[in-house]
Amino acid sequence: METLRVLHNLIRWLILVFAFWTVISAISGLASKRAYSNSDNRSNLFFMIFMDIQLLIGLIIYFTNGWFESLKHIGESMKDPMVRFFTIEHSVMMIIAWILVHAGRISVKKAATSQSKFKKSLLYFGIALLIILIAIPWPFREAIARPWFRWF
């Protein structure tokens, strides 16, 4: 189980790299009015792939680590900030971000012009990135803090 937590932590950083790359690429593409490139496509493809891997690992952790069991006692679980965060908030926000990344990828692929691809990229992937940043249990978030890097 600890191996999955370490992987979940490390993949978070890959997701953030590709998310920022995708959003910055969309902003620069809109500003410069350049053509949508293979690099732009790859950034959101890798963003989506790592989100898929992260979701799979996260679901395994969720169902094997007892967070799902907390739903049986939802009233008590909601009183504890850490249990509430990992049982409801983190998982729901990350699933919403995952949906936005997939919807964004489909929408960008269907867009006819480079400018519309960049606009859709900025909208979908920008909102997904914002949700991800909110849903991560950063070390400075007192009740739910997790380390910057988790090692074995």
Enumerate the predicted regions with their spans.
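Membrane-embedded alpha-helical bundles that constitute the cytochrome b-like, heme-associated redox core
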Residues: 1-152
